[in-house]
C-alpha cells in the first residue's frame, strides 16, 4: 500500500487559493503515484481528496467510488478537471471534509449541490482526455473537490445565515 500523506486542516492558507493547472511535462508515473498516495490517505470516512488538502497547489483530485454497502468499487485519479455540465435539481445534504475534523472525527454541515455532473479531465499517466457522467454522491464529491481546487471550502457554499459557519467553527475549536 502506498505511503499516506498528511492532510492539512481547514485554516491552512493553501486551501483558500486557486490551484495551478498541471503542465504536460508533469504527466507520467510520478503524478500517478502521487494520486495513489492521495487515495491511500482518503481512509474509510472519505470518498475524495484534492491536492491542496495535502499541501500541493495543483489541479488534481482523487475519488474512491463506493457501492451501496460502502465498499470501494473504483479508484480514480483526476488531473485538470473541468465540469462541463451540472444538471438535475439542486439538492441539499450534509457534507463533510477531510480537512475539517476534530478529535479524529469529520464535522458535517448542509451544502446544496447539483444532482449530476459531466466531467472532463486528463489521465495522470498519459495526459489523455477522459470524460464521464457522475450522479448522486459521486457528483457531490466531484463538485466538492473542484471547489477545493478553486480555493473554496464546503462551508463557503452555505449562506452565512443563522450563524451556520460560526457555529461550525465554534464546534471545531471545542473539539480541537
Predicted regions and their residues:
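Positively charged
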Residues: 1-176
